A protein has these predicted regions:
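Short terminal or interdomain "cap/linker" segment that borders an active site or interface and mediates
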Residues: 24-27, 136-164
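Long, hydrophobic N-terminal alpha-helical segment
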Residues: 29-39
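Intrinsically disordered, low-complexity segments enriched in small/polar residues
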Residues: 32-33, 102, 156
Length: 164
């Protein structure tokens, strides 16, 4: 199912004389993906994949998936438009995932999660260039997962693995 089927002609798209659909180049990634409906579909597919992954599902035990999806949708909307300069995303990532870092969450899990996001986008027929752009928005957050895992390991062992 293509995301353009969710929103057949998004306001940022226009039709040329040859009836080719074009995107307004100034539109945000969020809008080019198809807006709220498209991101909702991506997040739903994304969480289906995350919950089926035995290497990740343990991190979701005992939490409200509906609440997580709402947070994820808001975060992706922000990330795919423009993250406010006043928002310290690395700190937010560390704070929001602190319990999970203590459970062993690390950059290898981040890589799996990012892979599932790419697979969700692919399964919904998102164009490769848009999928690549979406993944490129998320990849810089990997450093927060490396840092969070190192902090949790230090707290657990008392050994600082980040120093030489």
């Amino acid at each position: 199912m293509l995301l353009t089927l969710i929103l057949p002609l998004h306001p940022t798209e226009f039709t040329t004389k040859n009836n080719k659909r074009m995107m307004d180049e100034t539109a945000s990634l969020f809008d080019r993906l198809g807006g709220d409906s498209a991101v909702d579909a991506v997040v739903d597919e994304f969480y289906t994949r995350l919950l089926k992954d035995k290497g990740l599902s343990m991190f979701f035990e005992g939490v409200s998936i509906a609440k997580l999806k709402r947070h994820q949708k808001r975060f992706l909307k922000m990330a795919f438009t423009k993250i406010p300069e006043s928002l310290d995303v690395p700190k937010m990532m560390l704070d929001k995932h602190k319990r999970l870092f203590a459970m062993g969450l690390d950059e290898s899990h981040f890589d799996k999660v990012t892979g599932h996001l790419g697979d969700a986008l692919n399964s919904l027929g998102v164009a490769t260039d848009l999928k690549d752009e979406a993944i490129a928005v998320v990849v810089p957050f990997r450093a927060s997962f490396e840092q969070g895992a190192a902090i949790a390991k230090t707290a657990h062992t008392g050994i600082d693995s980040t120093s030489d």
